[in-house]
Amino acid sequence: TKSIAGELPCNEVYIYRNFGSKEALLQAAFNRADIGFVQNVLKHIDVMDEADRPLEERCHALWDPVWTFSVGRPDIIRFYLRYYYSAQYLTSAHELHHRNYQQLQARLSRYFRSPRDSWFLMAHVFETILSFCSHILSGELENTAEVSDEVFQLIFRTLQPYMLT
């Protein structure tokens, strides 16, 4: 909490007063980031219902704003990378994450052969986005249209056998 308070114009005592603990603060921050990501996907998901367009084109039309949203928020991605892969996430926020994604999963499940698959495939997409964003943040990759398309192709080719056309 000292480092958090040091980065913000507030006293450490306010963190405890408002959240009770550092863990509760991190969980609330994770919840906010999670909801923002899900809302962004839901905002653009209607493109998947455009049956007159080929599947890959529809998926790419959904991909572009999701990728732009993700790479445009480096602080959120850094936070996700630190928290999502932590033991605290497993004990404090895993169920919250699943609740946050229920609406998205319900919507996406109609595009997959099995609703069970949609949970695992959503996690795969999310974790792939995090992974490639981390490579961009570290300078290993540049945020270019070519990289975006390569990541899209990797994800799409992985999902394609599980998708309904």
Predicted features, each with a name:
Residues A28, K43-G72, V125:
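Hydrophobic alpha-helical connector segments
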Residues T1-A24, A28:
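Helix-turn-helix
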Residues R78-R82, S109-I155, Y162-T165:
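Hydrophobic/aromatic-rich alpha-helical bundle segments in the mid-to-C-terminal region
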Residues R17-N18, A51, F69, S114:
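Histidine kinase transmitter module recognition
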Residues N31-V38:
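Short, basic, alpha-helical segments at the C-terminal edge of helix-turn-helix-like DNA-binding modules
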Residues D64-V71, F79-S86, I155-T158:
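Helix-loop "lid/cap" segments that line or gate small-molecule binding pockets
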Residues T1, E23, Q27, D52, ...:
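Short, structured helix-loop boundary elements
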Residues V38-L42, G72, L81, A87-R113, ...:
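Amphipathic alpha-helical packing segments from all-alpha helical-bundle domains
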